[in-house]
Amino acid sequence: SPHPNLPIVATACSDRSVRVYSLSSFNLLSNITGGHKRSIRSVAWKPDSGTSALGESVLATGSFDASAGIWRRWEGNSGKVNQSEDNEVDFTKDGGDDEDDEWRFAVVLDGHESEIKSLAFSPTSPLLATCSRDKSVWIWEELEDDNFETVAVLQEHEGDVKCVCWHPSEELLASSSYDDNIRLWREDIDDWGCCAVLSGHGGTVWWVEFEGATHTALKAQTEQQQRLLDLREAAGPRLVSCSDDLSIRVWRRIPKDRPNGAPQTGPKMPSIIKTNTIEEEWVPETALPQQHERAIYSVSWSKITGRIVSAGSDGKIVVYEERWAADQSTTQIETTDGTKEIARTEWVAVAEFGDAHDVFEINHVVWAKRRDAGRRSDDEEIIISTGDDGEVRVWTLENFS
């Protein structure tokens, strides 16, 4: 998990530790131990960690011991990040070699009955989501003085819940499961409930991730292209998922353009009629080109370029890019102003790394800003991958701008 503000990355390890590496020098900076009794499965940074206003990094860890841990570390005095001119983070200024001085194990969150598979902090509220092999999703609210309160236990999945992720600008949570489905959750008055079920995958859905809220990879040059971009702006960020069925799918929301979720013009999927319903309609937009031969465990959607990277059991890392359809084809949609034509896009595989971790499976891939001396621009990105070989590898796309 790359830090949201500092040039560091945290990795979860089977030896019950979390290792923090510099993205400037690629050196090991910290080895965080002592919080869990079994292997650590997942890590996640609090989105405002290390900002000048807060001055504190907060890291959550999910473990095979069925607990989640919250770790805290102050990044220097007066709320300022302790960094040198080359963006290297000094983790030893105040703490020496004493790991307990660096990272404080603030609180343990118990409640799940078996291993925690994934966890994620909300970027819009003081909430943390965790999911588990016990088929449940828990939502925790952070209070003062290292206290967390359980605000929801969601148990509608019929299999292990593999992943949770938050919408970048709304209090909307996505979860994916061994039951082949994706569920979206919202708060309805005082209770959290399922607002959409995304079905279509033919196997375990290993990972889900929302599109960034700000990237502008596509530029409109025609009226039809601008209509598509306007439609996407109204719908908000899309969702990408990957599965045992060898597919990567992109899902989009049908925006509610009338108050209280009234039906839109044109065909619409049937839904249960409620007063003040939280239900949303999400539809499959496209499937990316099939490049993998075995289960796809991880996808990551770049918040800068809009590219998607995938990896999995076959040891491949594949990068995809969305472009305007080469044949300039359009499709028709129904709007309040009648039928309109909008442009189409297509996804193209632009890079592939085979045997990226030799003969081993790849567990996770993620985009991060490039911070080392070789970076060519402030927006250049790297891909970080972890595999069953116990290694963390870093990749660049030298041939692509």
Predicted regions and their residues:
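Blade-level signature of beta-propeller repeat domains, shared across WD40, Kelch, NHL, RCC1
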Residues: 366, 374-401
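A structural motif specific to WD40 beta-propellers
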Residues: 27-30, 79, 104-106, 149-152, ...
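Loop/turn segments within WD40 beta-propeller blades
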Residues: 1-6, 43-56, 113, 118-126, ...
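Short loop/turn segments immediately following beta-strands, especially the blade-tip
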Residues: 72-97, 141-146, 186-190, 252-278, ...
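Beta-propeller domains
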Residues: 13-33, 76
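WD40/WD-repeat beta-propeller blade N-cap
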Residues: 33-40, 46-47, 90, 100-102, ...
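Conserved strand-to-loop turn within each blade of WD40 beta-propeller repeats
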Residues: 12-15, 61-66, 73, 124, ...
